[in-house]
Design a protein with these regions (language model features):
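Long, charge-rich, low-complexity intrinsically disordered regions
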Residues: 1-72
Length: 72
């Protein structure tokens, strides 16, 4: 997997903003039509603990929280 295979960072941020700041791998798959592996890698590379964090929902789904877009 090469970086050019991954969606652009700005594209992922736009999707996160539109979806209220909380997205899952499945959200990214549906929105841009990539594989689960590419979607997961795209989100994982953005996790920095400040702007983007990870949370596990009550049903065990990993949710990526784009903190600048939540609670607006």
């Amino acid at each position: 997997m090469y970086p050019e295979d991954l969606p652009r960072e700005a594209e992922v941020y736009r999707i996160a903003r539109r979806l209220g700041g909380r997205i899952t791998v499945s959200d990214l798959i549906v929105e841009i039509g990539v594989s689960a592996q590419i979607a997961e890698q795209s989100l994982e590379r953005l996790v920095d603990g400040t702007r983007v964090g990870i949370e596990v929902s009550d049903n065990g789904v990993i949710v990526y929280e784009f903190r600048e877009f939540t609670g607006r």
